[in-house]
Amino acid sequence: MSQLGNICHADYMSTSTESQERSLNNPNDTHPEIVNVVSTFQLGVKLELRKIVQKARNAEYNPKRFAGAIMRISSPKSTALIFQTGKIVCTGTRSIEESKIASKKYAKIIKKIGYPIHYSNFNVQNIVGSCDVKFQIALRTLVDSYLAFCQYEPEVFPGLVYRMASPKVTLLVFSTGKVVLTGAKDEESLNLAYKNIYPILLANRKEDISNQ
């Protein structure tokens, strides 16, 4: 959640009125872009974190601030949170495949330091996506219509929080049309959540509401 503010934007080019209307009514014309994948995996061995940061590049360990060591690599760009138990959390990649590649690179680095690792249990814990529906949304009207699923406190946070039951994904919806999706474990769930929310957002399009 801490990285949700770093939302990627998609290029948009103005087209004819006909194509714009077609896009508004077809969620397949846009889709969420993955901006962060969080995964976990195990190395099957206890780790001495001070030893790791002494021998590895781009690694730090301050137990007064955080219980794990932090390591970064540039390709694929990512950050690993390394714990004494041998559990590692990988974050910052833009796809599941990148996350797998990064996790194996971290495992290889620790193996080279001298640990008899056993790489296992790679699991995606969270996929964060973002998109822009290209129209403004009447958040107050939306929350009134879907009160059971929504939380909206504009004095605390400018976005509406929509908790979808199936798939189990949380969406942050902004009046500008920006949408952030979090909690998906696979791309299918991410895209399905967007497909489900799109007609709801379209029904609460600010221009349409104001003309009623």
From Swiss-Prot:
CDD domains: TBP_eukaryotes. The keyword Cell wall biogenesis/degradation does not apply. Gene3D superfamilies: TATA-Binding Protein. It is found in: Nucleus. Sequence repeats lie at residues 30-114, 120-201. One of its GO terms (biological process) is transcription by RNA polymerase II. One of its GO terms (cellular component) is nucleus. Pfam families: TBP. Its main location: nucleus. Belongs to the TFIID complex together with the TBP-associated factors (TAFs). Binds DNA as monomer. Belongs to the TBP family. General transcription factor that functions at the core of the DNA-binding multiprotein factor TFIID. Binding of TFIID to the TATA box is the initial transcriptional step of the pre-initiation complex (PIC), playing a role in the activation of eukaryotic genes transcribed by RNA polymerase II. This is TATA-box-binding protein 2. It comes from Entamoeba histolytica (strain ATCC 30459 / HM-1:IMSS / ABRM). The lineage of its organism: Eukaryota, Amoebozoa, Evosea, Archamoebae, Mastigamoebida.
